[in-house]
């Protein structure tokens, strides 16, 4: 893990198209801004974990469905 020290308004660049800016530092909280292309998904860790848990739960629900056999009518 790379560990960096930054001050307010300083930036960290990731690759060619992701920019992290330190917006504010107050006590033990750091406010950051993330500038990334729309194709890059950016989540807080707790939100990402919630999404993963919901996806797993949906997968289990979908596999438990007992759908009747579907018949396709031929024209």
From Swiss-Prot:
Biological process annotations from GO: bacterial-type flagellum organization; mRNA catabolic process; negative regulation of translational initiation; regulation of bacterial-type flagellum assembly; regulation of carbohydrate metabolic process
UniProt cross-references to InterPro entries, sorted A to Z: CsrA, CsrA_sf
Keyword Glycosyltransferase appears in the UniProt entry: no
GO CC term (a single one): cytosol
UniProt keyword annotations, A-Z: Bacterial flagellum biogenesis, Cytoplasm, Repressor, RNA-binding, Translation regulation
Cellular compartments annotated: Cytoplasm
Entry keyword Transferase: no
An example Gene Ontology molecular-function term: mRNA 5'-UTR binding
Record's subunit section: Homodimer; the beta-strands of each monomer intercalate to form a hydrophobic core, while the alpha-helices form wings that extend away from the core.
Function: A translational regulator that binds mRNA to regulate translation initiation and/or mRNA stability. Usually binds in the 5'-UTR at or near the Shine-Dalgarno sequence preventing ribosome-binding, thus repressing translation. Its main target seems to be the major flagellin gene, while its function is anatagonized by FliW.
NCBIfam families: csrA (TIGR00202), PRK01712.1 (NF002469)
UniProt name for this protein: Translational regulator CsrA
Organism: Treponema denticola (strain ATCC 35405 / DSM 14222 / CIP 103919 / JCM 8153 / KCTC 15104)
Gene: csrA
